[in-house]
UniProtKB/Swiss-Prot annotation:
Disulfide bond sites: none
EC number: 5.6.2.1
Catalytic center residues: 305 (o-(5'-phospho-dna)-tyrosine intermediate)
Species the sequence originates in: Staphylococcus aureus (strain USA300)
Binding site for Mg(2+): 8, 104
Protein name: DNA topoisomerase 3
GO cellular component: cytoplasmic replication fork
Residue span of region Interaction with DNA: 186-191
Transmembrane segments: none
Length: 711
């Protein structure tokens, strides 16, 4: 009898097979005398669509809403059904005695495996592999400490409740809004509050009125002393009068105070912090950061589990620090890492805190030494950031003397503040940091002359627009960006981690860009006309970050066995009914900002102009019509003059190709040029290359020229 190991991806299955010496490769799995290891391809099973409950629901109609199934159905995803059949056969195989779930150690990973097992009707015992890295050592250690699968039942119930709630709310709210206003509009418990966050910030900026104010400083022996005052001076004349009173008046050093202080490194990275820093440093978006991090985790095995919300490590990891430091010796930080090899680490260090680690600890290097030449430029940047933060956390604090010199002149107090580094500590890892020396020439009681007075003009600045990094942080801490009626709600938002999860926030932002609810201009995220109208048309409670936080709080309670999933789902059903009825009874109107005067050839309604990756197209405003029409698109045909790609306008014989250089030619001329160029002889390789490149494009001249050739 054998144990069947179910991994989430083929790459992880290969890692497990390698770690456990499961060497016999089969079709869709690996095998040895003790284990069989197979894999999902992400989700193999998903929630059924409305039309899979009732074929009449394929057409979107307002009168059919709300759609609330008595029992939720799941279906096998068509494109991965072959692998599902393989997994199913293995689960039901008589030689398999039990199942070891080895999907990602988290809510979504649990759902991936359990949906498959439930769909198959598994009755065999379940064990759980729960690890935070996929190195050979971590896998082998994890298999020595397999858990009873029943310990994770509540995690599964929470994952299933989240999935079903999102389906019930999302399907109904989106269909209701879309059919009510004849527009492709989408609502969701996470995406709609995120639009509201961006909109609130945008309104704050638009309503901001800058205020002018002034500051005064004195220069003494080359040092600038700032006027100490509890008020902001908005009247320049007040400071000018003060300057007049200071003329020909000497000052006196009232005190020189030195206080020794320490500063400590930032917390270890969680996913959100890492995504934010990658955008701040390199303008790399959250989605790209997560994909790169996943590659470092799965392919290179040099970092721990990516989707974590913790900034801390567990105390049982203390003994692993040395081998992780050893791995970082391959980086440019080897000189800073080397002294740490002789240091003794204690579980009392601030980075170790079991209470602040739930599913996964902070993102840190594994014990695997990276082959730096194998890392892409983006992977290298990300790995360096993780190593830098990790080594800083293990280094001594930065120490400095905070010097405060107080000057009195004509009854006014001016202050000079300087920090003098005495011990670099963790800051030694940063380029350009060094020990500083300040030969400050002041002693208490000194009489000093003022060499210069400076009145500086300032202006208050509005809040900054969100970028992809700061929006992530706002989703994590929305209580810092919105006004709440009750302070207790701020605590709720803080405890639940805000809107969405570390694993989903990047996807939500990406989705909002794709549905044209938000846009980024020069790195500034703004709400589009469509996004603003979604907020106006959506039920008010669905735009609030508080509601989704309260839901997330209940999901966490389900995960901990303190709330019934069934109760939560019933609450979501009642909420959905209210949302749908509210939309049905609304008298608000939706105005397309991209509506054209072109009539749809199918239904006669006016069409909407939308941007695509390669150009523009017209789409019928009625979502049930689905008529589309190309307006313009980039082709692979090249301009004969400047060799740039030509843009195709129109269709059929009316089509025209234009270039940015001014060149233009008709479809007939293009056909003739391509035919002449080919001379009736085209290699099979060239034909395949162009046919694949232009697959699905209408009016493709090269494709047309090739299709009748006999090869």
């Amino acid at each position: 009898m054998k144990s069947l190991i179910l991994a989430e991806k083929p790459s992880v299955a290969r890692d497990i097979a390698d770690a456990l010496q499961i060497n016999q490769k089969r079709n869709g799995y690996f095998e040895n005398n003790q284990y069989i290891v197979t894999w999902a391809l992400g989700h193999l099973v998903t929630n059924a669509t409305p039309e899979q409950y009732d074929k009449n629901l394929k057409e979107w109609r307002l009168e059919d809403l709300p759609i609330i199934p008595k029992y939720m159905k799941t279906v096998v995803i068509g494109k991965t059904s072959k692998q599902f059949k393989t997994v199913k056969a293995l689960i039901l195989d008589n030689k398999v005695k039990d199942i070891i779930i080895a999907t990602d150690a988290g809510r979504e990973g649990e759902l991936v495996a359990r949906l498959i097992l439930d769909k198959v009707g598994n009755k065999k015992p379940i064990r759980r592999l729960w690890i935070s890295s996929v190195t050979k050592k971590a896998i082998q250690q994890g298999f020595k400490n397999l858990k009873d699968g029943r310990q994770y039942n509540d995690l599964y119930y929470a994952a299933l409740a989240r999935s079903e709630a999102d389906w019930i709310v999302g399907i109904n709210a989106t269909r209701a809004l879309t059919t009510k206003y004849d527009a492709q509009l989408s609502l969701g418990r996470v995406q709609t509050p995120t639009i509201q966050l961006v909109n609130t910030r945008q309104q704050e900026i638009n309503q901001f009125k800058p205020q002018q104010y002034f500051t005064l400083s004195l220069t003494v022996k080359g040092f600038d002393f700032q006027l100490e005052s509890n008020q902001r001076y908005t009247n320049k004349e007040t400071l000018e009068q003060m300057v007049n009173n200071l003329k020909n008046v000497d000052g006196k050093i009232k005190s020189v105070a030195t206080k020794h202080k320490k500063s400590y490194p930032q917390s270890l990275y969680n996913l959100t912090d890492l995504q934010q820093d990658m955008y701040r440093r390199y303008k790399i978006g959250p989605k790209e950061t997560l994909n790169t991090l996943q590659s470092l985790y799965e392919r290179h095995k040099v970092v721990t589990y990516p989707r974590t919300d913790s900034n801390y490590l567990t105390t049982d990891m203390v003994d692993t620090m040395k081998e992780r430091i050893q791995a970082t010796m391959a980086t440019t930080y080897k000189d800073q890492a080397r002294p740490l090899m002789s240091k003794t680490f204690s579980s009392k260090m601030s980075i170790f805190n079991n209470q602040k680690v739930s599913d996964h600890h902070a993102i840190i290097p594994t014990e695997v030494r990276p082959v730096m030449s194998d890392l892409s430029n983006r992977e290298l940047k990300l790995y360096d950031m993780i190593v830098e933060r990790f080594l800083e956390a293990l280094m001594p604090p930065h120490e400095y003397d905070a010097i405060t010199v107080t000057l009195e002149v004509a009854g006014h107090t001016f202050v000079l503040k300087e920090n003098v580094t005495t011990v670099l500590g963790f800051k030694s890892i940063r380029q350009g940091e060094s020990i500083t020396e300040m030969q400050q020439p002041f002693s208490e009681g000194d009489e000093v002359k003022i060499s210069k007075t400076n009145i500086r003009e300032h202006e208050t600045t509005p809040p900054e627009y969100f970028n992809e990094g700061s929006l992530l942080k706002a989703m994590e801490n929305p209580q810092n960006f919105i006004q709440l009626k009750d302070k207790k709600y701020a605590q709720t938002l803080k405890q639940t981690g805000g809107i969405g999860t570390v694993a989903t926030r990047a996807d939500i932002i990406d989705k909002l860009f794709n549905m044209n609810a938000i846009e980024s201009r020069d790195g500034k995220i703004k709400v589009t006309s469509k996004g603003k109208q979604i907020l106006e048309l959506a039920p008010e409670e669905l735009t609030s970050p508080l509601l989704t936080a309260q839901w997330e709080e209940k999901l966490l309670l389900i995960e901990r066995g303190k709330y019934q999933a069934k109760t939560f789902i019933n609450e979501m059903k009642d909420f959905t009914k209210d949302v749908v009825n509210g939309i049905k009874n609304s008298d608000r109107k939706y105005k397309h900002d991209n509506l054209t005067t072109t009539e749809c050839p199918t239904c006669g309604k006016f069409m909407i102009k939308v941007k695509t990756k390669n150009g523009q197209m017209l789409v019928c405003q009625d979502p049930s019509c689905k008529t589309k029409k190309n307006v313009q698109r980039k082709t692979n045909a090249r301009c004969p003059n400047c060799k740039k790609k030509l843009t195709l306008f129109g269709k059929g014989k009316e089509a025209v190709y234009r270039c940015v250089c001014g060149h233009s030619e008709t479809q007939a001329h293009m056909d003739q040029r391509m035919k002449s160029k080919s001379s009736g002889k085209v290699s099979r390789k060239e034909m395949k290359k162009y046919m694949n490149k232009n697959e699905g494009l209408d009016n493709n001249p090269f494709k047309d020229a090739l299709k009748n050739l006999n090869l």
